[in-house]
């Protein structure tokens, strides 16, 4: 079960984005976050998945627990391995390139030398299906496989 209790997120030490957010999501339950632009939907998901950039905001109060264990300070990769992830709707891939080339091209964005290979290996470890299809043309992947990519 995912439990969020009294979550508060502040941007730039002054802008209160989330205040008092509490929710329990049972295993297997499907939940939708609805709200106007700027309501905090993306911030909530980024806080849960560990992707809240420290330059964007800080969790200043509250707890985030999954199956009884705190995940608030956990590395995003460990959160994914525990079964929590955010899948974005849009797919931006190079359909004419291989899976391998797509992953390597994506790795060059704001990366230091050597980090591309490390990032590539990490993704291949997280998504064995992509590893099995690394030489395939990305445009021939299923929709779900394209989202993984």
Where are these regions (language model features)?
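ABC-type ATPase nucleotide-binding domains, specifically the catalytic core motifs of the NBD
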Residues: 12-13, 31, 52-55, 74, ...
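Short beta-strand immediately N-terminal to the Walker A/P-loop
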Residues: 31-32, 86
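The feature captures the beta-strand-to-loop junction immediately N-terminal to the Walker
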Residues: 34-36
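ABC ATPase NBD Q-loop/coupling interface
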Residues: 51-52, 63-81
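Short coil-to-helix "N-cap" segments within the ABC nucleotide-binding domain's helical subdomain
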Residues: 58-63, 109-125, 132-139
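Conserved ABC ATPase signature
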Residues: 96, 137-141, 145
């Amino acid at each position: 079960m995912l439990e969020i209790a009294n979550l508060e997120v502040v941007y730039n030490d002054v802008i209160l984005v989330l205040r008092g957010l509490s929710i329990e999501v049972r295993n297997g339950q499907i939940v939708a976050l609805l709200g106007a632009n700027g309501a905090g939907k993306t911030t909530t998901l980024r806080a849960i998945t560990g992707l809240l950039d420290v330059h964007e905001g800080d969790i200043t109060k509250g707890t985030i627990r999954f199956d009884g264990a705190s995940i608030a300070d956990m590395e995003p990769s460990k959160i994914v391995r525990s079964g929590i992830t955010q899948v974005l709707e849009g797919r931006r891939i190079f359909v004419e390139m291989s899976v391998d080339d797509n992953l390597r091209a994506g790795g060059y964005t704001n990366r230091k030398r050597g980090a591309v290979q490390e990032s590539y290996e990490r993704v291949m470890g997280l998504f064995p299906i992509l590893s099995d299809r690394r030489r395939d043309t990305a445009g021939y992947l299923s929709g779900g496989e394209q989202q993984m990519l």
